[in-house]
Amino acid sequence: MARKKLAKLILMTLGILMWGMVSSRAATAASGTLYVVSTGPGDPQHITVKALETIKKADLVLCSSESAKHLQEILKGKKVEDPWKELWWHQGKVWMKDLATFKPEERAKIVAEKKRQRDEYVKRLKTLLAQGKNIALLDRGDPTVYSRSFWLLEGLDPDQVEIIPGMGAMTAAMAALKKCSTGAGARFVAQTAPFGFFGKTDREDLARDLSHYPGTLVFYMGLTEIDNLVNTLQKYNPADLPVAVVYYAGYDDKEKIVKGNLGNILDQLASEKEKFMGIIIVGQCLEGPTFTLGEETKEKPAISKGPDQGK
């Protein structure tokens, strides 16, 4: 009798364990995924097949109203929502970008409020994911470079997120220029922006240090700081170092290239009105040979020695 009771107890225990495992797997299988989807730079034709397939299976698409209009044919019939209208703007400004323009006490309030709004929004996304819903968060260009999407994802478990890569603005810009960013003996390619390039205590540290080596500098969101960028680079590099600005990279009807060098690029850009949609490229790759075949580039290095070198 005791053996029968023990056997029955063991069977019940095994049954409970198996039920728990099946339930756990079922719950995991039912969980949705949030996809950060690159839609490429410029025209919709740059979007990848995988991105299209991901959008197709999404129950909810998150993107700016501008992107929704730009991709209206692709998003036809989808439920679309703009998360950035509330999360990204404050008094008509992009709060994270213009945070330094606010007084310290107001700055702290803005950060706290935006984090609260973000956390509330993420809480809602978690609920949808738990219900098995798939969400596509669209990102123009390369979603892994200066992407606001990652700020929104901070409250999510990495296992709930998948990144669908795609073409970035730098690739589109170099394609427009018909140049290779690693050409002319470049030892590095740096993707940066003014708020990262200019240090807080020593604003010229990178400009000074990188001028020791041949390389290519690619600046995002740099048009509003183009004067500071050029003037700083001029201190450590020769005036004939090539510079190019590609406006609206990837847009067939808007793409425009302005070429020059550190000595004349500001004059070349004086009549241009666009102050955001442009990629700035600096380096000998714009004019030098793609392959140096091991030859030294001492006569004209990509980022060469300037008058204030070593100070």
Spans of features found by a protein language model:
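Bacterial N-terminal signal peptides that target proteins for export
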Residues: M1-L11
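A contiguous loop/helix-start segment that scaffolds small-molecule binding in enzyme catalytic cores
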Residues: A29-V36, E106-K114, A130-I135, R148, ...
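Class I S-adenosyl-L-methionine
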Residues: A26-Q45, V49-I164
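Bacterial N-terminal signal peptides
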Residues: I10-M21
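Short, well-ordered beta-strand core segments
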Residues: L60-V61, C180, L217
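Alpha-helix capping/helix-boundary segments
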Residues: E66-H70, T144, A169, E225, ...
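A short acidic, often aromatic-flanked loop/helix-cap motif at beta-alpha or helix-coil junctions
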Residues: W84-G92, A169-M170, F197-G199, Y251-D253
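Class I SAM-dependent methyltransferase SAM-binding "motif I" and its flanking Rossmann-like core
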Residues: L137-Y213, K256
